[in-house]
Amino acid sequence: VLAGTRDGAYRSMDFGASWWPAGEGLIERHVRWVAVRASAERRTPADAPSEATPGAFIGTEPAAIYVAEDVQQGWRRCDEVAQLRDRLGWYLPYSPEAGCVRGLAFHGNRGYAAVEQGGLLRSDDGGEHWQLVAGSDGVPRTPTDPTMIHPDVHSVVVHASSPDRVIAPTGGGLYVSDDGGAHWRRLTDRYCRAVWVDPDDADHMVLGPAAGVARDGRIEQSRDGGKTWQPAMDECDAPWPHRMVERFYEIGDELMAVLSDGELITAPLSTLRWHVVLPAVQDVNAIATLGI
């Protein structure tokens, strides 16, 4: 198990019974996102079959991306990300820190990284190197070009059908690209941080929009690619006055949602009838499944 904290990363080899520091090489130590790719997903270029691609990734605040082939050997910073951060003036409205990387998604050797108040990054070599997608200029201001993504990117999903199908919730709405981030369409202009996309049907989505930061949050569903949205909170009081969905996780036949107040709710994907799970556990930030 690999976990990120406000002061580095920690690793457990006994499913959380004991923890050991695993942050060697981290300059920016506030970890906002952790991603681990299985060996089968770590494909190397055909002309370099002996070279290993990174298996673990960390996104930090201030915004930086770190990669590791073996966590025990330490982390390497992708300096091009920090250089973009400093040159373009990435920031967070609630913090003096220079933006943050708060989401990573992979499809084969293609990777995407969500930067809050910075835009969307792309890697074509398994996460070794990163650059802004063509449809994101990296400038933390609302774009005037409707084919550009809003820079306040909260998370990112790449669809199972294609590495070019990318969906990103932002402070300016939900965006989708069919060409790897070169051009974007805004599906809704509502503030959102989380979306789930059906791996078998890219037009089927569950969204957690809100009127603003943790204000009047709700859960909605679309089956037509975002043209229309219907309420998906049969067992909840909507909207929530002071909270919203931070993340969705598909686990088996269930969809789980982490809320901004740290509560964890779940629902069968077939009905989306939500209920609270683990009520005694507070301040949940993220969840992961373990292959036990």
Per-segment meaning from a language model:
Residues 1-292:
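Extracellular glycan-interacting surfaces
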